[in-house]
């Protein structure tokens, strides 16, 4: 690493990534995993979403929605909970492992945070 002129090293970078930013990253990546039909919001997210539609005239684009993902950022770690719906024919354990891996990688790549990802399969759609 190159030192700046004058011989002193640059101070360490301090930053904070918000819960919503991490949730959007996680939701976007989870939706791309084969076998994930949709993300499912829990009751608290549903109620917040209803309140948000009354307060905000501009809807959030689908690719930026974070329903189905709950995040708590603490220091250099993010606790991420993802709730998905799959379709019949996908192995739930394999799907959960893939979502966990993909979401964790996306959060690390984008934010630099280590992520503890928990996946819940809320429903299986039948043909």
Question: What residues fall within each predicted segment?
Answer:
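A short beta-strand micro-motif common to beta-rich folds, especially ectodomain repeats
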Residues: 99-103
């Amino acid at each position: 690493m190159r030192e700046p002129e004058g011989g002193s090293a640059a101070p360490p970078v301090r930053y904070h990534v918000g819960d919503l930013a991490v949730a959007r990253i996680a939701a976007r990546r989870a939706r791309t995993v084969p076998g994930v039909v949709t993300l499912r919001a829990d009751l608290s997210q549903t109620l917040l979403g209803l309140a948000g539609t009354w307060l905000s005239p501009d809807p959030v684009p689908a690719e930026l929605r974070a329903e189905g993902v709950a995040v708590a950022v603490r220091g250099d770690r993010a606790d991420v909970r993802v709730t998905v719906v799959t379709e019949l024919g996908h192995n739930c354990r394999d799907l959960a492992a893939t979502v966990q891996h993909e979401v964790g990688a996306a959060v690390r790549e984008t934010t630099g945070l280590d992520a503890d990802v928990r996946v819940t399969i809320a429903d299986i759609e039948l043909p």
